[in-house]
C-alpha cells in the first residue's frame, strides 16, 4: 500500500511539474528536483547536473524556443521508474512549428524528489 501511495505522489509531482514548465515557472519545477538532479539537455545534447545547471539550460532554451509538453499516460516500470508518454510541441520564437511528436520521459525519484530523467522515442518504450 505504501508503494502505491508513493507512486501516486510521484505522478502528482510530475503533473504539477509539467504544468509549471508550460507556464515557464522554472523555480516551481526545480523545487520538485533533487539538488544534484541529472537532466537531459534535449536542445544541445548531453546532460546537465544540478538544479542551477538545469535552470541555466532552460533559460537558454526559452530564449530561442517555445516548448510545450502535455503528459498523456503514465506507467510504472519494473525498475521502479515512472514513464510518462508526452505530446511535445516546439515552436521557434517566430511561431514556426519545429516539432510535434510523442516522446517518453522516464523519471527516477529519490527521497520524494526527481533524481533523473531520460528522454526516449515512444517506439523504444
Task: Identify what each model region corresponds to.
Residues 1-32, 36, 113, 125:
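Short, low-complexity N-terminal intrinsically disordered segments enriched in polar/charged residues
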Residues 24-27, 40-45, 91-94:
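Short, charged low-complexity linear motifs
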Residues 1-9, 55-125:
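A beta-strand edge to alpha-helix "cap/lid" segment located at domain peripheries
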Residues 38-48, 60-64, 120:
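A short gly/proline-enriched turn/hairpin at secondary-structure junctions
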Amino acid at each position: 500500500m505504501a508503494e502505491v501511495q508513493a507512486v501516486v505522489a510521484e505522478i502528482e509531482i510530475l503533473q504539477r511539474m509539467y504544468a509549471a514548465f508550460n507556464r515557464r515557472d522554472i523555480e516551481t519545477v526545480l523545487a520538485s528536483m533533487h539538488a544534484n538532479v541529472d537532466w537531459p539537455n534535449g536542445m544541445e545534447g548531453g546532460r546537465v547536473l544540478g538544479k542551477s545547471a538545469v535552470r541555466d539550460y532552460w533559460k537558454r532554451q526559452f530564449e530561442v524556443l517555445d516548448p510545450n509538453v502535455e503528459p498523456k499516460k503514465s506507467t510504472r516500470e519494473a525498475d521502479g521508474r515512472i514513464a510518462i508518454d508526452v505530446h511535445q510541441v516546439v515552436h521557434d520564437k517566430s511561431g514556426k512549428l519545429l516539432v510535434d511528436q510523442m516522446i517518453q520521459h522516464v523519471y527516477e525519484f529519490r527521497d520524494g524528489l526527481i533524481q533523473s530523467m531520460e528522454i526516449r522515442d515512444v517506439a523504444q518504450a
